[in-house]
């Protein structure tokens, strides 16, 4: 994923995602038509119809009075609602989250301040976390919301906040994959709404089970049990991707071929905690399938100097630290050999602790303090060429190049380069000569190293 982002940034084309075009949203039912159809079929009540239809009309009216960024953001959310209606995606269970999103955007963009990219906000009287996705409005940040709930649980003295947050989010789940899922209602990195995530759903499992263990509230256990559906179901409805070893749980339901490790590992942490608390044999089976796959692939994400984000490229600093934390959590659970034996199951049905998660987490922690290894590979270059200098680099780093002829600096360049044998641009002089080259590599954690060498440029 990072490799894709670097390439996109180089071309200046990376965006969160575009709103559905009016043409794309005009082939199926309109929003008002879809709501009316649900009402006439008795799928929704008069009260629900009136609330959602009124909210939709209010948002369209507000849009007409806005301009600039505010109009763009609210317009994108409206376009997403219209596109889902046209695609037949306005099912009854999806309406609460979808129209809450529309109303919160109408409220924010008519009365609130402009927001920075990825800025998070909340509303008075609510514990739900929202995030600004530029060009897509503000959207419910499910991972952050369930993470907030985990924080309330772990503090031990914020039970009222924990209850409020869970009581807010449970009614916002959508019927999906034979169970329920907390869906994202916006375009993101090629994904079209509505989509879901093994990462956020795994965190939901974890905190719902924890809350049930504390409060014995049946609704929390029921929601957690129903949330297992996406882990049993293949994309695009679910996130389960079968593998020779077991299964991997996709971070994005729309991108089953992306093997993003941090989201997968956190989904396993959530499944482990859910199963340890509830003793549910289905949870055990789902964890076992994912655990078998994780033990097979985790070593492949360790380059020896840094972590891989997915099968395509290295992690940025935030994701490296996040993956390390998730691996530490899984290490703590499996190293202790905590049995996950449901009532009535054979005594041997448990997780066998080993060191894969632990040693990898330790190595990733050490990587945060280890300088990159860099070497100059090019020794001779043709004059008047743009081929650049070839380097050897152990991990993703910001690399700076200085070229001197005698005491005179004749060329400088810098770039963020991934590991391997990348090239750094140097347009060599046509007249040739001998040049001193110095390179400095600074990794994403701030560790740096330098190297120097001599390059002979030959005449064309």
Question: Where are the model-predicted features located?
Answer:
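Short proline/glycine-enriched turn/loop motifs at strand-loop junctions of beta-rich domains
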Residues: 392-398
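Carbohydrate-binding/catalytic loop surfaces
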Residues: 117-136, 179-197, 241-262, 302-326
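Well-ordered alpha-helical segments within folded domains of soluble proteins
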Residues: 75-85, 96, 138-154, 195-212, ...
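Low-complexity, Ser/Thr/Pro/Gly-enriched N-terminal "stalk/linker" regions
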Residues: 26-141, 154-184, 301
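Structural helix-adjacent loops and short alpha-helical linkers that scaffold large soluble proteins
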Residues: 27-28, 46-51, 61-75, 82-95, ...
């Amino acid at each position: 994923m990072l490799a894709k982002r670097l390439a996109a940034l180089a071309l200046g084309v990376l965006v969160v995602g575009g709103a559905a075009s009016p043409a794309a949203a005009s082939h199926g039912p309109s929003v008002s038509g879809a709501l009316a159809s649900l009402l006439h079929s008795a799928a929704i009540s008069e009260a629900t119809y009136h609330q959602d239809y009124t909210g939709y009309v209010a948002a369209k009216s507000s849009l007409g009075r806005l301009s600039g960024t505010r109009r763009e953001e609210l317009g994108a959310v409206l376009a997403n609602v219209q596109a889902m209606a046209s695609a037949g995606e306005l099912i009854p269970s999806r309406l609460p989250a979808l129209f809450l999103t529309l109303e919160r955007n109408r409220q924010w963009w008519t009365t609130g301040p402009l927001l920075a990219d990825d800025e998070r906000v909340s509303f008075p009287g609510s514990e739900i976390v929202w995030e600004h996705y530029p060009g897509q409005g503000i959207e419910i940040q499910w991972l952050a919301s369930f993470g907030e709930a985990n924080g309330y649980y772990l503090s031990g003295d914020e039970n009222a906040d924990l209850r409020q947050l869970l009581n807010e989010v449970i009614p916002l789940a959508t019927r999906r994959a034979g169970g329920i899922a907390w869906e994202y209602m916006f375009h993101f990195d090629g994904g079209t709404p509505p989509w879901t995530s093994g990462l956020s759903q795994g965190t939901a499992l974890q905190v719902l089970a924890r809350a049930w263990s504390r409060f014995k509230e049946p609704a929390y256990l029921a929601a957690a049990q129903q949330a297992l559906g996406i882990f049993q179901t293949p994309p695009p409805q679910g996130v389960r991707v079968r593998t020779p070893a077991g299964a991997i749980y996709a971070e994005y339901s729309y991108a089953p071929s992306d093997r993003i490790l941090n989201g997968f590992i956190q989904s396993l942490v959530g499944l482990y905690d859910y199963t340890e608390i509830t003793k549910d044999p289905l949870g055990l089976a789902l964890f076992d399938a994912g655990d078998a796959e994780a033990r097979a692939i985790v070593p492949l994400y360790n380059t020896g100097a840094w972590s891989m984000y997915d099968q395509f490229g290295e992690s940025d600093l935030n994701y490296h630290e996040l993956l390390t934390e998730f691996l530490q959590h899984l290490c703590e659970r499996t190293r202790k050999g905590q049995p996950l034996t449901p009532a009535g199951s054979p005594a041997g049905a448990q997780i066998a602790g080993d060191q894969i998660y632990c040693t990898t987490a330790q190595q990733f922690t050490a990587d945060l303090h280890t300088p990159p290894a860099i070497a100059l590979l090019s020794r001779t270059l043709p004059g008047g060429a743009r081929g650049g200098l070839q380097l050897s680099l152990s991990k993703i780093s910001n690399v700076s190049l200085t070229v001197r002829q005698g005491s005179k600096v004749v060329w400088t360049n810098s770039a963020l380069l991934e590991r391997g044998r990348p090239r750094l641009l140097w347009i060599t002089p046509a007249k040739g000569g001998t040049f001193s080259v110095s390179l400095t590599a600074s990794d994403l954690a701030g560790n740096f190293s330098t190297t120097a060498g001599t390059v002979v440029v030959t005449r064309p």
